[in-house]
């Protein structure tokens, strides 16, 4: 099947009404502007959902392109994020991780590309894009020192933090002195990939995709193209672990996907990006 960018835009467009319904609009509610997750909680890390509103506002192919109401929704979400973040600028994952630098890293991964795109549109005269860039960019800038200080919980989190800090530094060069030493310290540990292309958690359907994406994003922000080598190795290995029905072997995992019947859709963006880059 050929790749058609417009099909993906249409899929995102279809998700917008449901996301609007999840955003709390009651001005008297303490979580006004926030998003209610599948767990029924308005977890602070859900501020990353604002990225969808930003994307469809910015994408010319979207039927929501240029709709100012979406800018207002982004700003309300960002205001909620400012109210709910911790003193260190970090966000909670309410079901398990509090004041969490890795979950903040996942949030920055989601928001940074929108800020980058919004800046380009703002430079071309789009006032709404400038508002999106300012609202979401502030969350990223404030979060960076907290990610530096906060540490991580699991192996893949190192690379989530490396990518998030790299993206923050690319957007805000004034952060370089604070975040670059942490990036280099994590990278000095070397990537946890073996000769077969397997990462240490062996999580073929959940965390290997997270590592691949994180290393790829870091490579792009840092222009450290050697970081793509373990991604290539893992994607090659993962291909050989796929069954005919597109599910992947999960019996090797040491994480919660062990034994799951899963299609590794999280690998799709890395396969596509490396295929285009390498002509493979």
Give residue ranges: language-model regions:
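Low-complexity, Ser/Thr/Pro/Gly-enriched N-terminal "stalk/linker" regions
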Residues: 1-48, 68, 72-76, 80, ...
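Sequence-level detector for tyrosine residue identity
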Residues: 3-5, 53-57, 91, 186, ...
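Generic detector of well-ordered alpha-helical segments enriched in charged/polar residues
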Residues: 6-9, 13, 17-21, 137, ...
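Aromatic-lined, polymer-binding surfaces characteristic
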Residues: 38-228
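Glycine-centered small-residue hotspots that permit tight backbone geometry or close packing
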Residues: 24-35, 87-90, 195-197, 246-250
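Extended polysaccharide-engagement surfaces of secreted carbohydrate-active enzymes
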Residues: 225-280
């Amino acid at each position: 099947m050929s790749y058609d960018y417009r099909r993906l835009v249409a899929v995102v467009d279809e998700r917008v009404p449901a996301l609007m319904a999840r955003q709390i609009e009651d001005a008297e509610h303490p979580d006004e502007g926030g998003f209610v997750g599948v767990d029924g909680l308005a977890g602070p890390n859900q501020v990353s959902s604002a990225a969808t509103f930003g994307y469809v506002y910015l994408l010319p192919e979207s039927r929501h392109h240029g709709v100012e109401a979406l800018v207002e929704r982004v700003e309300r979400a960002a205001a909620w994020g400012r109210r709910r973040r911790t003193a260190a600028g970090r966000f909670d994952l309410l079901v398990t991780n509090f004041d969490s630098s890795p979950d903040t890293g996942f949030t920055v991964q989601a928001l940074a590309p929108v800020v980058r795109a919004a800046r380009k549109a703002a430079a071309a005269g789009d006032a709404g894009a400038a508002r999106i860039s300012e609202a979401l960019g502030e969350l990223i800038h404030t979060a960076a020192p907290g990610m530096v200080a906060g540490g991580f919980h699991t192996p893949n989190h190192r690379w989530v933090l490396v990518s998030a800090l790299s993206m923050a530094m690319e957007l805000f060069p004034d952060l370089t002195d604070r975040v670059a030493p942490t990036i280099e310290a994590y990278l000095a540990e070397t990537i946890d990939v073996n000769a077969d292309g397997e990462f240490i958690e062996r999580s073929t359907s959940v965390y290997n995709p997270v590592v691949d994406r994180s290393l790829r994003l870091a490579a792009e922000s840092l222009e450290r193209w050697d970081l793509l080598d373990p991604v290539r190795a893992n994607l090659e290995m993962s291909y050989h672990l796929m069954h005919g029905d597109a599910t992947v072997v999960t019996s090797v995992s040491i994480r919660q996907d062990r034994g799951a019947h899963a299609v590794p859709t999280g690998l799709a963006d890395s396969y596509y990006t490396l295929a285009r880059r390498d002509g493979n």
